[in-house]
Amino acid sequence: MSFLFLEIMIFGAEENTLRLGVKTKPAIHDDLGIIPLFSWYHESFDKEVDITGVRIPPLEMACKDFHACKWPKGLSIRDQSLALLFDAYNEEIKDHVNEIRSKCEHIITFSHFVPRQELCPEKRMLFYPNLPKVIGSDLLENRIRKIHGKEGNPKACHVFGHTHFCWDAVVDGIRYVQVPLAYPRERKRRMNGGERWLPFCVFSDGKFGDKHSPCYWSDYYAVNPRTPHNMELAPWVSPFYKYRIQR
């Protein structure tokens, strides 16, 4: 696969989305700027200590991307090469971004992947504790800060996805929101998301919508500190690993 073919794969989908009425370019609506951002994850995004004492399936077994995605030579899921490539595509919209920053009072950026690790539960809370290695990008967070400002501001919001954890929190001056529809089986078990939550109004009448409630994980971390060095698996996770004890 060549880089040219990769770009055709990525950007060629735009024609089909336009037919559906889906816009993929930065845009201004009244006083609101909307900026979609390219990104891909990298393993080094995970800065927290790994869970030990149990055998966790390798990423290749747990993540379909390792088998379903084919990349040109020189690009790998195991390093930052893909994250750097996708972030570089954001340079192509920098003129649109500068226009939005100069004209708009409120700005919403959005991405599929996660920009900060604290927007995901700690590893001991996760059915797959190594999930943080395949969810986000530091480059994405840097890009967001270039747009909204290093310190953020009350009129900045970033909408993200991928993990299916409901989240609505302000971190370092920027509001981060994920209100997932989730998979049908997750909705059936009332895990992570559901139709009853949606649609969620992010912006209306010149202001951001009220905080989504209930929002289990961000509500949890609003009152509980993050303790990534805690190796004790959560009660709903430990049964899945009781036969995987490392010896």
Language-model regions: role of each:
Residues 1-5, 25-26, 41-46, 114-118, ...:
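Active-site environment of divalent metal-dependent phosphoester hydrolases
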Residues 131-132, 136-155, 163-247:
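Binuclear metal-dependent phosphoesterase catalytic core
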Residues 3-9, 48-51, 123-126, 172-175, ...:
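Short, glycine/charged-enriched secondary-structure capping and boundary segments
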Residues 15-23, 92-106, 143-158:
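A structural motif corresponding to the C-terminal end of an alpha-helix
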Residues 28, 38, 180:
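Residues at the C-termini of beta-strands that transition into short coil/loop
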Residues 34, 112, 162, 176:
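Divalent metal-coordination and catalytic microenvironments
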Residues 35-108, 113-131, 207-247:
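Active-site-proximal loop/helix segment associated with metal-binding centers of metalloenzymes
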Residues 1-33, 122-136:
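Core catalytic region of metal-dependent phosphoesterases/phosphodiesterases
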